[in-house]
Amino acid sequence: ALIDYFRKYGDKYDIDWLLMAAQGYQESRLDHAARSAVGAIGVMQVMPATGKDLGVGDITEVEANIHAGIKYMRWMMDHYYGDEPMTKLDKALFAFASYNAGAGRISQLRKEAAKRGLDPNVWFHNVEFVVADRIGSETVTYVGNIYKYYIAYHLLIEARDEREQAREKMKNLNEGAP
């Protein structure tokens, strides 16, 4: 299932798999049949040329598509933000913004954020304000949606785990009852 691929490649590339699943949801609603007007393919909406460059196999296959999307995000995080004094989450958020608006543009806007007295290494309530001001809401909405889906996925996983723990406790209580 999709979750297994997100876990596998999230682990391989040291990126929170829930964050990548959230990006997949933003890109395609996790629909591997999705195709964009510009030719992006699958769950992660990978362009064929990018998929070929990444060397992960046939991106028309769901596993290779998810592999490509996660590998590409890891490359963006390392290439553009690897040496930046940011949290892992901010590196991912800036990589998403760069994916959406272009790394050069985001780099310029980080510098502008610093000039405005904002933290150029923090996305939320800092660089996102400059991005919204200079290029509009699309990138801010894109990154914000991914983060909202990420939080929702986290809450769902926590609730599931709590239910399983409660069931196990009830089972143990029932087994110990006379």
What are these regions (language model features)?
Residues 1-178:
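Catalytic glycan-binding domains that act on GlcNAc-containing polysaccharides
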